[in-house]
């Protein structure tokens, strides 16, 4: 991307949290920032130093006493002249200042993610760094925080840049063979020196792309489904683990028909727990649809909690190949050891055995938090572009009969796909979709 792209509008937005609050931060960015400060804040403050000042309306009415910071271009978040107004966080105060800014000629309210979009367009960050910033803001667990910070570092850029340099070197070797095939000091065959490295590179890209599921679990959560017969106590277990009433609990079989979800933070890892419809021969079409959804969700889960009522055992089938924790519920109602073998005996009603169950869940999900320090593709678009890069390399490797010119073109297409991941190559059509996921003011 170019070092700096001129943008005509000056934008502003509330960048801090919901109101009322102790402090509210309004961010301004664009060419008119200096004019705004001169009129509304009594002049420019020293760059990057906080200045206590009155904030004025156009009629010179004092709207608030605030801290003002000025960040001149290009040494700012967006690469443009920027300012921050740290106001008292009352709704009326913030509304008055925002209304005054909206009336200022040349200013408009920022769109979602527009400050970060300008930072990208002005070369202050690449596209994966912007996506990582969005993840950092949304992080709910320690693993998500660590993963977002790793993705916002330059380690990913170094990895992809290294791959692109290898492709550039390979293309240079091929071009040399094409242009100087008759010269004695040029290697006799590009295939002997180039294509073996290209095979290794393709394998590295494929293995990297295949690690996306690890990133997906860190970002979106380790997916757990509670599966069992009607009245096994699935909804009661969901409520007990969530420590709040999420699901309706009744003695009537088939109460749960839609899938209910709750997110938990277990030892720094996000875990998404889903309560599903009881598995049985359905009494009606609506319940049958719920059971169908339950089985489909179990097939997509990372872990199945197979729950059984020890006083009335009935075990549904579990999708093959899925990790399963077998749980005997209502253990408070029996005195003898149940005939069936369970990984854990609990009572969702009294809390008996829940600590042991949480230990088992933690053991099943713990390994994924260790991946938070790795460089992994963390968006579906990354995986798609990595796939395009690998496919182009495969076409070049297998294209011994198509000529070196076309094989070199395959390497160029692979390099372009890698460049699109970080936004170095033609990604204008993606920008609105990516930055619209940010909050206003970021």
From Swiss-Prot:
<feature type="binding site">
    <location>
        <begin position="275"/>
        <end position="278"/>
    </location>
    <ligand>
        <name>GTP</name>
    </ligand>
</feature>
<feature type="binding site">
    <location>
        <begin position="231"/>
        <end position="236"/>
    </location>
    <ligand>
        <name>GTP</name>
    </ligand>
</feature>
<comment type="function">
    <text>Exhibits a very high intrinsic GTPase hydrolysis rate. Involved in the addition of a carboxymethylaminomethyl (cmnm) group at the wobble position (U34) of certain tRNAs, forming tRNA-cmnm(5)s(2)U34.</text>
</comment>
<dbReference type="Pfam" id="PF01926">
    <property type="entry name" value="MMR_HSR1"/>
</dbReference>
<feature type="binding site">
    <location>
        <position position="84"/>
    </location>
    <ligand>
        <name>(6S)-5-formyl-5,6,7,8-tetrahydrofolate</name>
    </ligand>
</feature>
<dbReference type="InterPro" id="IPR027417">
    <property type="entry name" value="P-loop_NTPase"/>
</dbReference>
<feature type="binding site">
    <location>
        <position position="124"/>
    </location>
    <ligand>
        <name>(6S)-5-formyl-5,6,7,8-tetrahydrofolate</name>
    </ligand>
</feature>
<dbReference type="InterPro" id="IPR006073">
    <property type="entry name" value="GTP-bd"/>
</dbReference>
<keyword id="KW-0460">Magnesium</keyword>
<comment type="similarity">
    <text>Belongs to the TRAFAC class TrmE-Era-EngA-EngB-Septin-like GTPase superfamily. TrmE GTPase family.</text>
</comment>
<dbReference type="GO" id="GO:0003924">
    <property type="term" value="F:GTPase activity"/>
</dbReference>
<feature type="binding site">
    <location>
        <position position="235"/>
    </location>
    <ligand>
        <name>Mg(2+)</name>
    </ligand>
</feature>
<dbReference type="InterPro" id="IPR027266">
    <property type="entry name" value="TrmE/GcvT_dom1"/>
</dbReference>
<dbReference type="InterPro" id="IPR027368">
    <property type="entry name" value="MnmE_dom2"/>
</dbReference>
<feature type="binding site">
    <location>
        <position position="27"/>
    </location>
    <ligand>
        <name>(6S)-5-formyl-5,6,7,8-tetrahydrofolate</name>
    </ligand>
</feature>
<dbReference type="InterPro" id="IPR005225">
    <property type="entry name" value="Small_GTP-bd"/>
</dbReference>
<dbReference type="InterPro" id="IPR031168">
    <property type="entry name" value="G_TrmE"/>
</dbReference>
<dbReference type="InterPro" id="IPR018948">
    <property type="entry name" value="GTP-bd_TrmE_N"/>
</dbReference>
<feature type="domain" description="TrmE-type G">
    <location>
        <begin position="221"/>
        <end position="366"/>
    </location>
</feature>
<comment type="subunit">
    <text>Homodimer. Heterotetramer of two MnmE and two MnmG subunits.</text>
</comment>
<dbReference type="GO" id="GO:0030488">
    <property type="term" value="P:tRNA methylation"/>
</dbReference>
<dbReference type="GO" id="GO:0046872">
    <property type="term" value="F:metal ion binding"/>
</dbReference>
<dbReference type="InterPro" id="IPR025867">
    <property type="entry name" value="MnmE_helical"/>
</dbReference>
<feature type="binding site">
    <location>
        <begin position="250"/>
        <end position="256"/>
    </location>
    <ligand>
        <name>GTP</name>
    </ligand>
</feature>
<keyword id="KW-0630">Potassium</keyword>
<dbReference type="Pfam" id="PF12631">
    <property type="entry name" value="MnmE_helical"/>
</dbReference>
<feature type="binding site">
    <location>
        <position position="442"/>
    </location>
    <ligand>
        <name>(6S)-5-formyl-5,6,7,8-tetrahydrofolate</name>
    </ligand>
</feature>
<keyword id="KW-0963">Cytoplasm</keyword>
<dbReference type="GO" id="GO:0005525">
    <property type="term" value="F:GTP binding"/>
</dbReference>
<keyword id="KW-0342">GTP-binding</keyword>
<dbReference type="Pfam" id="PF10396">
    <property type="entry name" value="TrmE_N"/>
</dbReference>
<dbReference type="InterPro" id="IPR004520">
    <property type="entry name" value="GTPase_MnmE"/>
</dbReference>
<protein>
    <recommendedName>
        <fullName>tRNA modification GTPase MnmE</fullName>
        <ecNumber>3.6.-.-</ecNumber>
    </recommendedName>
</protein>
<dbReference type="GO" id="GO:0005737">
    <property type="term" value="C:cytoplasm"/>
</dbReference>
<feature type="binding site">
    <location>
        <begin position="329"/>
        <end position="332"/>
    </location>
    <ligand>
        <name>GTP</name>
    </ligand>
</feature>
<keyword id="KW-0479">Metal-binding</keyword>
<dbReference type="GO" id="GO:0002098">
    <property type="term" value="P:tRNA wobble uridine modification"/>
</dbReference>
<feature type="binding site">
    <location>
        <position position="256"/>
    </location>
    <ligand>
        <name>Mg(2+)</name>
    </ligand>
</feature>
<keyword id="KW-0819">tRNA processing</keyword>
<keyword id="KW-0378">Hydrolase</keyword>
<keyword id="KW-0547">Nucleotide-binding</keyword>
